[in-house]
Amino acid sequence: NNLLGFEIGDLTTGKMLHRVEVQGFNRGEVKRHGCPSHGIALTPDERELWLCDGANNRIHVFDNRVMPPVQRTSIAVRDMPGGISFSLDGKHAYSSTGDVIDVKTRRIVATLEDQQYNSVQSEKIVEIHFRDGKPVAAGDQFGLGQVRKKTEAK
């Protein structure tokens, strides 16, 4: 669809609870995915929701601690984003545009380039931590949040 925003639904009932549209930007044409807001992710602490905007070359940041989430800021990226993921420690966001964003300051701190300074872009970004030459932790390309609800012991 052409929604520049997202919807929140109740998985049990199938009912839509909230429809959140990006404010201050117009929907526009996109080159891929057919939808201006294809990529969406939660920060690992789940306090924020980050939404890709392929029509305006932006990532919009929403406060996810309130319902419906409230738009707080927008970050300009160098090309049309189609995905976003986060570092395991939650300090950096990786846009499919190759921009690495400091989550706290909202500033681009690095851009991925090849040896000839060409832009490197991918929706498939995986963070792997090594210790003594062996992988000990791995992220994934999905910004699903990392908060785990405590369950009662039986």
Language-model segments: what does each one mean?
Residues 1-154:
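Predominantly soluble domains enriched in secretory-pathway, periplasmic, or organellar proteins
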